[in-house]
Amino acid sequence: MSSRKKIAILVDLELNDQSGGHVKFWERISQSLVKKKLNIDLVFFFLGKKKKTIKVSENINFHIYKPGFSSSNLSFLGIDADITDLSPINLGLLFELRHYNLIHTTDQLHCMAKTAKLASRIWKTPLTTSYHTDTPSYTEYYILEILKKLPNFLDKLFIKKLRIHKRIS
């Protein structure tokens, strides 16, 4: 095993040609470091259609994990946000993270972040996070859009009376 420190950066979104700004941001960060002499190993974790590793440079890799329950499964409801994993935990990732000296999550709410919190507690690995998206506001928006598709009486009950979209977000 390398004596270099290993840092895991968990993006928790699908890496594909249609990926949005959050994924592009981390791709650009990795590309800006390609020609640098790093004394650390950086591994960026993304989601994808199948599990694989993409070697970006000597010290930079992309590990692609297949989501347990992809948010793309909900596209029939009109959810068109970037694809994430809605599973509660990713066991493969949990055991992979024991090999890292630092774990960094780029969200706090989805599968990779939840898995990172657990891994940090189990293996006493430092955990940092950065906040890039106002996920609660997005959640409220999408829940409201889904509820509007219900029959009128349920729409009124869930939105106007119970305000479900406010409670879930």
Functional labels for PLM-detected ranges:
Residues M1-I60, R98:
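N-terminal subdomain of nucleotide-sugar transferases
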